[in-house]
Amino acid sequence: MKPIVLTSLVLLAGALQPAQSAKLEKLTPLRVDLNALQSPEGLQLERKSVREETVEVDSREVALRHYVFRFFSQRFMDEDWWHDAHLFVPVELADSARGKLFLVSHVVSWRKVPGVLREGYGRQPAARVGVPVLVFKPNPVQREFAKRTGLNSEREWQDATFDRFRKTGDANVVSFAGIMTAKWRAWTAAEAVFGKKFDKVILAGGSKGGLAVRAMMKFDPRIISVVSSGSIPFASPTMLRKLTEREPLTPHLVEQFKIKPADLANDTIMFNLGSNDHNAHPTEARLVMEQLRGDARIYVHPNGGHPALAPQQGAAMRLWLRHVFFGDPLPDVRPPVVEAGENSLGFRAVIKQPKGVEAVELCHAFYREKPWPGPASRERMPHKNAEWKTTPLAKRNGHYTATLETKGADLGRLHYYIRARVRLGQVTGWLSCPVQQYVKKP
C-alpha cells in the first residue's frame, strides 16, 4: 500500500481578504540553510541532567540513558523560542542503531498530556525499538503573543502567521516554517548533548507538525522517513482549484510546503490517523493513499480523534520505526474483499507479506458520506461523530474472514476497513488499510 492537515489553516479557507494577497507582486520562497541549522552556534544549550532509568519490555528491563536539556531555536513571531527536551538513548546501543534518531514534537499537547509524549513517544520506542529518541516541547505561542494581543489560543496565533503571509507573500513567516526550524535545531542540540552525529533520522509530527515534517523531508537527505498524524496532503486538483478561488496565495503555500500527494508519491512515509479526525477526512485519506507508490503504510484508529493519543497509535509508530530503521518486512494491509449475501456481508482480509500478523479485525461504522469542504472548514462532518465497532476475523483455510449482519441497515452509509495486529521481534503494533465506503455491486 502506498497516505488533514492544517487544523487551523484559515489561510486556505479564505477567511481574510483574498483581494489584498492577490495584489502581491513578489513572493518569497521558503529558505532552508542546512549548514546554519546544523551549527551548534546560537543554541545557548543548557544541560540539565543525565540519569539512567529502566523500562520493562516483555518481562525484562531495558536500561536507558536520559538526557534533559534546554535550547534556543529561533526568534519567530516576535518571540524567543526556548524548548525543554528529553533524549532517551539505550545504554547498550547496538552497532546497527548508531547514527539513527527518532525525533518527535508537535504530535500531542505537551501541556495536556506530557506523559504521552515522553513515555509513549519517548521511552517506549527507545527501549523497544532500540534507537535514540528525542522529544521536545514545541513553540511557546501563548506567552508574548498573548500579552501583546490578548489572544490565548494556538489557533489564533497560527492565524496571525497567515495574516503576515498574506501581507508579505513570505513563506518563512508561516507557522510551518517556525516548526521546521525548531525541529532542525532540536536535532543539532541532541547531537551536541550526545556528542555524536545522527545521519539517519525519522521525524514525527501531528496536524501542522505533520505538514512540517513532510516538507522537511524534501530539504534534508538525512531524513529517511516521517510519521504524519492528524494531517494528510490535499487529494485532488479540484480541491486546490477551489481553495485558490478563495485564497489566491494557495498555490505558493502548496508549492513551498509540498502539500500535494504528488510531492510524496515515492517517499517512505506512514500516516497515523484517527477515524473521526475532523482534519483527516477518511475518504480523502483513501484517495491520497491510492496515489502513493513508495514504501507507505497507514493506521486508522477506530473512534480516534485529531491527536494521536491512543496506545495503539504509538504501537503502530514503533512498528514503522522497526521496519524503516532495521529493514524488518512489514505486512501491507489492503482493502478487503466484500461479498454480499442475504442480509449479510462477508469480508475477507487481503494482507500482503503477512508474516508477523497475530490478529485481524473488521472496523465498521454507519454515517452519511459528505465531501470534504477543505482545510479549516467549520462545516459539520458526519464522520467526526461516527461510532465505530470492531469484529474479530477468524482464520480459516489460510484466510481471515468475518460476516457482518446487515438486515435493516442502510448500506449506503456503511464505511469499513481492516486492521491487523503485527509483531516484529519485541515490537507489537497495528496497521490498517484506509477507510472504505461500501458500494453495492451492479
Task: Label the model's feature ranges.
Residues R297-L309, G314-R318:
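Histidine-bearing beta->alpha loop at or near hydrolase active sites
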Residues G42-S96:
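N-terminal cap/lid segment of alpha/beta-hydrolase-fold proteins
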Residues P237-Q291:
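The feature captures the conserved acid-bearing segment of alpha/beta-hydrolase catalytic domains
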Residues R185-L249:
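Primarily recognizes the serine-hydrolase "nucleophile elbow" in alpha/beta-hydrolase
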Residues Q312, L321-H364, K389-N397:
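Surface beta-strand/loop "capping" patches
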Residues E79, D84, P90-G130, L134-R148:
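Short, surface-exposed "cap/lid" segments of acyl-processing enzymes
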Residues W110-P114, A126-A127, V131-T181, P233-K242:
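Cap/lid segment of the alpha/beta-hydrolase catalytic domain
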Residues G425-P442:
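Short beta-strand elements
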